[in-house]
Structure formats: C-alpha cells, structure tokens
Amino acid sequence: MIISAASDYRAAAEARLPPFLFHYIDGGAYAEHTLRRNVSDLADVALRQRVLRNMSDLRLSTELFGETLAMPVALAPVGLTGMYARRGEVQAARAAAARGIPFTLSTVSVCPIEEVAPAIERPMWFQLYVLKDRGFMRNALERAKAAGVTTLVFTVDMPTPGARYRDAHSGMSGPNASLRRMLQAVTHPRWAWDVGLLGKPHDLGNISAYRGSPTGLQDYIGWLGANFDPSIAWKDLEWIREFWTGPMVIKGILDPEDARDAVRFGADGIVVSNHGGRQLDGVLSSARALPAIADAVKGELKILADSGIRSGLDVVRMLALGADAVLLGRAFVYALAAAGQAGVENLLTLIEKEMRVAMTLTGTHSIADISADALSRVTRERADAISP
C-alpha cells in the first residue's frame, strides 16, 4: 500500500486490526454526528493564500510549557494504545521523541509510566482522569513525578462515559463480547502474533500497579465506569493544583465560560476538545468552538486543540483559528497500528511537510505568524457569526 496521508494509514489499520479494536478507535458517541463534523468543519476552514512573500526562512519550532517543540504538535493521550501495536505506548513515545515533540501517556495505557518514561530522552506528559478513587489519583501523580513527567493533562469531560453504539456492534462491548473478540483475533493472525502473543502482558499498567493485581481488558470498562465522578467541580481540583507544581492543562473545554474558569483556577493551558466526538454527540466541533474560546482567553494561558486533525494543513487551520498547538490522536494510532514506531515517525514527517506547504502559501514565516489573518474573509465571517 502506498502511504501518502493519514487516510492511508487508517485503511492499513482497518485491514490489520481485529474489528473490535479498529472500531473502538475509529468510532464515536451515539450516531457520530460530532465525530464527522470534527473533520468536515475543519476541512471547511478556508485559508488566505499569499504569494511573493520570500518564504526562505520558514520556522516550525515553538516553545510550550518550557519545552522546545520541533512543531506545534503533541501526541494525545489514547487509552489502550498498547493493544494497537506491541508495547504501543513505548513505540509511539519513541516516535514522538525522534521527531522532537511530546508524547502524552493515558491513565488507561497498557504500558505503565515506569516502562514508557525511561524509553525516551525527552520529558513525557501524563493524562489523568477525575476519578472517585482519589488514592489512585494521588498515586498516579506521585509516580508521574518520580518518572520525570513535566506536564499534567487533566481530562474533565468524562464525568460519565459516552454511549458508543459502535462498540456494541464490533465486540468491544455487548452480548458475548469476549467470544467475539477471540474469534476476531484468530482471523487476524498478524495482529494476534505480534500484539496478542508477543505484546503481553495485556494489562492496564498504571491501574494494576496501584491495585496490586493485573487489570485486563475485561476490567477496563467496569473499573473506569465505577470510578468516574459526576459530582466533580472546580473546587475538587484544588488539591491537585497544590500537589502538582508543574504545568497543568485542562482537557475537554468547549465553552468560553469554562475557559475563563480554567484561567481563574490557575491552569497553564486548556485543550479545546470534544474527546474526538466520543462523549456527547451533537456538541460543537472543536474547530467551531475554538474561535470564541480564543477570543475569551488568548494570552492568559496556552490554548491547545484536538479532534478532527488529520494533516499538517489541519494543524495550520487550528492555529489560525486560535490554538497555540494541537494534540494528534486517532491519526497517530492508525499509523501505529499499521507500521509501529516507523509509521508514526513517517506520519509526523508528512504532517511537517504539509505544514511547510501551507505556511509557505499563506505567507506565514513562523508559528507565531499564524493568526486569523491567515483565514479567508468568508471563514472569519463564519467564525464571528457563531461567537456567543
């Protein structure tokens, strides 16, 4: 298969993975309207082409939370990444480090913090959920500190799990799920050998280290479902802000007022995100929500964005809409599933090349130059029309 874009990696991942895993990463909540709009709304963002601007001094590097990034991209936290490639979190972290960008480890990773952090030379980020078991949260934060994690990404848009209908059809959940997953694995021998057999243990490493016993895929939904905390409020995060002295990013912001609350709370950054369309179907896409949030808090904290980003062109679009950097989720998992660390490295190379083309043809010499001026007049008017 010829690989020239993230969509090619998606096709390769679908061919290689058992359906329950492919559809788990590919699907969204309910009828998946927001999932689709994340991509289509971003694709509708028209840029303003400029010519004869002497673009010989193009620069993609940027500073974020005291780190130098080769480009304004970080790999997003994705649960169960280690089920998509053998010790997948380690491979993805190495790919990110090789391309000079951060990797964010999920709370529900297969590989624990202590396995991933020593595998790379640059600092790692860590994502944490708001859970009822505060002992687990404190334990995870202590272990993250000990492992040299620099930035905490705090996910707040999961007080309860989203309803993902596709999971029931694919075998991730629903009737006879275990049997269906086993049959799917048997019919995908390359994955079964490389990940199913050689990729063991299939464990949620960060959770089992706290519980003192293995926590496999079957426990994933049950343990998390019992521990999501619908009573959480900003005041409940105060002890975390006191405990964690490094940069803290609040992930899951879609409303300007919530963004202002994050500023008042003392967050160092936010992620404008609808969880990749996996939580509440029918909410705004990140691309539609971003301009109003940027108008409200730009300059008071760092604004990151995710959901729907599939190319370097999409990265430039998000920056023009008001983001300082982006998180890349599904796209890197497709590449990881298809070709491991090399696949993720190649995807990041493609994204960098696409960014260079977009910046050259919009006359933006550096990341700091990418602003609303890079948007077409039609796009700017549309963004103004949906601002609260």
Curated annotation (Swiss-Prot):
<keyword id="KW-0472">Membrane</keyword>
<dbReference type="InterPro" id="IPR013785">
    <property type="entry name" value="Aldolase_TIM"/>
</dbReference>
<dbReference type="GO" id="GO:0006089">
    <property type="term" value="P:lactate metabolic process"/>
</dbReference>
<feature type="binding site">
    <location>
        <position position="164"/>
    </location>
    <ligand>
        <name>substrate</name>
    </ligand>
</feature>
<feature type="binding site">
    <location>
        <position position="155"/>
    </location>
    <ligand>
        <name>FMN</name>
    </ligand>
</feature>
<feature type="domain" description="FMN hydroxy acid dehydrogenase">
    <location>
        <begin position="1"/>
        <end position="380"/>
    </location>
</feature>
<protein>
    <recommendedName>
        <fullName>L-lactate dehydrogenase</fullName>
        <ecNumber>1.1.-.-</ecNumber>
    </recommendedName>
</protein>
<feature type="binding site">
    <location>
        <position position="129"/>
    </location>
    <ligand>
        <name>substrate</name>
    </ligand>
</feature>
<feature type="binding site">
    <location>
        <position position="106"/>
    </location>
    <ligand>
        <name>FMN</name>
    </ligand>
</feature>
<dbReference type="InterPro" id="IPR000262">
    <property type="entry name" value="FMN-dep_DH"/>
</dbReference>
<keyword id="KW-1003">Cell membrane</keyword>
<dbReference type="Pfam" id="PF01070">
    <property type="entry name" value="FMN_dh"/>
</dbReference>
<dbReference type="InterPro" id="IPR037396">
    <property type="entry name" value="FMN_HAD"/>
</dbReference>
<feature type="binding site">
    <location>
        <position position="251"/>
    </location>
    <ligand>
        <name>FMN</name>
    </ligand>
</feature>
<comment type="similarity">
    <text>Belongs to the FMN-dependent alpha-hydroxy acid dehydrogenase family.</text>
</comment>
<feature type="binding site">
    <location>
        <begin position="306"/>
        <end position="330"/>
    </location>
    <ligand>
        <name>FMN</name>
    </ligand>
</feature>
<comment type="function">
    <text>Catalyzes the conversion of L-lactate to pyruvate. Is coupled to the respiratory chain.</text>
</comment>
<keyword id="KW-0560">Oxidoreductase</keyword>
<keyword id="KW-0997">Cell inner membrane</keyword>
<feature type="active site" description="Proton acceptor">
    <location>
        <position position="275"/>
    </location>
</feature>
<feature type="binding site">
    <location>
        <position position="278"/>
    </location>
    <ligand>
        <name>substrate</name>
    </ligand>
</feature>
<dbReference type="GO" id="GO:0010181">
    <property type="term" value="F:FMN binding"/>
</dbReference>
<dbReference type="InterPro" id="IPR012133">
    <property type="entry name" value="Alpha-hydoxy_acid_DH_FMN"/>
</dbReference>
<dbReference type="InterPro" id="IPR020920">
    <property type="entry name" value="LldD"/>
</dbReference>
<feature type="binding site">
    <location>
        <position position="127"/>
    </location>
    <ligand>
        <name>FMN</name>
    </ligand>
</feature>
<dbReference type="InterPro" id="IPR008259">
    <property type="entry name" value="FMN_hydac_DH_AS"/>
</dbReference>
<dbReference type="GO" id="GO:0009060">
    <property type="term" value="P:aerobic respiration"/>
</dbReference>
<dbReference type="GO" id="GO:0004459">
    <property type="term" value="F:L-lactate dehydrogenase activity"/>
</dbReference>
<feature type="binding site">
    <location>
        <position position="24"/>
    </location>
    <ligand>
        <name>substrate</name>
    </ligand>
</feature>
<keyword id="KW-0285">Flavoprotein</keyword>
<keyword id="KW-0288">FMN</keyword>
<dbReference type="GO" id="GO:0005886">
    <property type="term" value="C:plasma membrane"/>
</dbReference>
